[in-house]
């Protein structure tokens, strides 16, 4: 009996050791590849910048947010074989400049600093936009990264102005920031989990010298109310929740960009994982850490999560298109969360993120040439129900992929 128990203990130890070695091997392999990955990414973005710069100025585009003749690359039009340029008021217009900032951080090449400054500067009008929540995301990815990476206070006033503008979309009765629609809309008050990504700007501004702590209160309130109404008991995220402004209750749940109200849109789940991890970093409130873990456990433990870590565009749509952008956001969130968790839980999150980054860095997902306009990641899905940008590169996919690689590099040193 003793020999049998001893054999079982040794076998268990061997299995554990094998798992540890596999994890170490995967991390070592990715770490060894990092210089080459960053070099390829830099070459791609030099070419992308060269192609996009002549297209920066074009016809005046009229959007709800305003008029502008300035454009930023968003993706690649496969059918037309050309860049998809969007107005500076487009919700992802900060991601391309943000990727340039990350490449400057990754390589130290002054070229990327110069180009990041050029593309960032044209986005300043977003600080005054009141017609949606997206402008704050634009400003944080561009000017926010300029502040963080350059270590300057030059952009503090602009970021503070953006926070003030965003706060105008906050309803203190509901405790939420309106995502879509005009501030005066009495019929609908739409909120999406993507909104959590804006809270970082509020937290950063609240901590500036002389910063207004009201922004921290708004961010916490929005995070708390989103936690209460936007997720099922199993941790799956709902995309669109519409609130009644008279009763202060949920009046409708919509599938939005997801397959249905009872599944979880993969990128929406990723936004939420990222948002609550960030809120824990900024506030130290353990409720946000615990919730980030719950959301992450739902994603990485879902029976429909593919073995390579790149999710289908919706967790309820197995066998359909994968979404590389969702994987990139998840990987970045999981790496940060792993550092907070530590122990076995942290090791689990880190290992899954490494698997995702390894997959995204493979020829299946990483573009080796200019076939997708020199963007990095293939196979992104923006809005499947609407038939928009399916199986294509996406600017925010590249942005979070680079961010995740930088986080991994910092942890692996």
Which ranges hold each PLM region?
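Bacterial N-terminal signal peptides
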Residues: 8-17
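Bacterial N-terminal signal peptides that target proteins for export
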Residues: 1-9
């Amino acid at each position: 009996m003793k020999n049998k128990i001893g054999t079982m203990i040794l076998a268990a130890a061997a299995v554990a050791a094998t798992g540890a070695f596999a994890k170490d091997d995967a991390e070592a392999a990715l770490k060894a590849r990092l210089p080459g990955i960053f070099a390829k990414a830099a070459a791609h973005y030099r070419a992308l910048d060269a192609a996009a710069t002549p297209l920066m100025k074009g016809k005046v585009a009229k959007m709800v947010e305003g008029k502008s003749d300035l454009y930023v690359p968003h993706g690649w039009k496969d059918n037309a074989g050309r860049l998809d340029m969007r107005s500076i008021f487009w919700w992802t217009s900060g991601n391309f400049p943000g990727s340039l900032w990350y490449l400057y951080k990754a390589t130290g090449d002054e070229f990327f600093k110069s180009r990041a400054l050029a593309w960032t500067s044209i986005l300043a009008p977003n600080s005054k936009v009141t017609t949606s929540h997206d402008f704050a995301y634009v400003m944080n990815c561009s000017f926010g990264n300029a502040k963080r990476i350059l270590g300057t206070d030059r952009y503090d006033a602009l970021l503070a102005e953006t926070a003030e503008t965003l706060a105008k979309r906050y309803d203190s009765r509901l405790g939420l920031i309106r995502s879509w629609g005009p501030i005066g809309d009495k019929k609908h008050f739409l909120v999406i989990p993507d909104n959590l990504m804006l809270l970082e700007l509020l937290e950063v501004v609240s901590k500036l010298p002389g910063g207004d702590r009201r922004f921290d209160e708004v961010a916490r309130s929005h995070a708390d109310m989103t936690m209460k109404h936007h997720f099922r008991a199993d941790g799956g995220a709902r995309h669109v929740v519409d609130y009644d402004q008279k009763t202060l209750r949920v009046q409708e749940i919509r599938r939005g960009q997801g397959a249905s109200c009872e599944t979880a849109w993969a990128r929406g789940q990723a936004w939420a994982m990222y948002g609550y991890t960030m809120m824990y970093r900024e506030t130290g409130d353990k409720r946000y850490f615990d919730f980030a873990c719950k959301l992450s456990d739902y994603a990485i433990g879902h029976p429909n999560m593919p073995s390579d870590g790149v999710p289908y565009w919706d967790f309820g749509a197995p066998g359909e298109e994968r979404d590389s952008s969702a994987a990139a956001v998840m990987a970045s969130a999981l790496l940060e969360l792993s550092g907070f968790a530590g122990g076995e839980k942290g090791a689990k999150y880190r290992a899954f993120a490494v698997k995702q980054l390894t997959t995204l860095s493979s020829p299946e997902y990483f573009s080796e040439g200019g076939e997708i306009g020199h963007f990095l990641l293939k196979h992104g899905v923006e809005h499947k129900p609407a038939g928009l940008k399916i199986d294509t590169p996406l600017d925010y996919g590249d942005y979070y992929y680079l961010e995740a690689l930088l986080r991994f590099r910092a942890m692996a040193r």
